[in-house]
Amino acid sequence: MAKSHQSVTMVELFYDLIFAYAVGRMAQTLAVPVHGMIAPQVLVEFLLMLLVFWTIWTFQTVLIDRFSHHEVTHNLFTLFNMFWVIVLSTAINPDFAKTKWPFQLSAAILFLSLASQYGLLWRRKHSQLAKTFGITLAACSFVILISLFIKPYTLSFAVFFGGVLAAGLMPLLLRNVLKATPADLGNLSTRYSLLVLLIFGESIIGVAETIYAGLSLQAGLFFLVVILLFIAYQLVYDNGLDRRQKTAGLAVIYLQLP
């Protein structure tokens, strides 16, 4: 009998909505045009910040997908993480030096929270995946906390993003461990598609705000690009994935990032 897919809970949908809001707010805060152009430095900063949010969200989603952790404890952790995601998003400032303490401290707390969830699962289920991810996330949280006390500021941020990048790439190095606990591709792809859909919605809202201020060719073209990207994504989602496979799910995880 084929394994039935997990259903997405209301708490998870709420969590995804908060993340979509955070990504949208981050884009609005950092994408401040200078002479009608977005500076390359701002684009790099946006991508680095996006990596932080994506890594946190991915580890939470992998935990739910692998272990079907729909319990009171999991819901409490999720609600706790929601609060810190909001703090993380409101801490973003175009002047990164002012962002350092609230942003990096919030990220450290979130990684430590995720490490605790994986640690509890390891104690209960003795899963090698839960143990490895728990240690990885705890180490990342420690590196982020250390980065808070490093000077100058540029070196502090380099250490911070180095820790986040190492955590984000860790699943690629643990392919065999992930295969030992196969992904529920139906659930995993649904979660990612819902988040992408919410982010597309945030983009449309951003266009609507500019249209309200006055119609422009630029706003119309941006709206068209968003719609075309959405259609392309839907075609790939509907036709490019065999959800019956038992895989590590790495393709679903990493191909969603671009």
PLM features: residue spans?
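Extracellular loop-to-transmembrane helix junctions
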Residues: 36-52
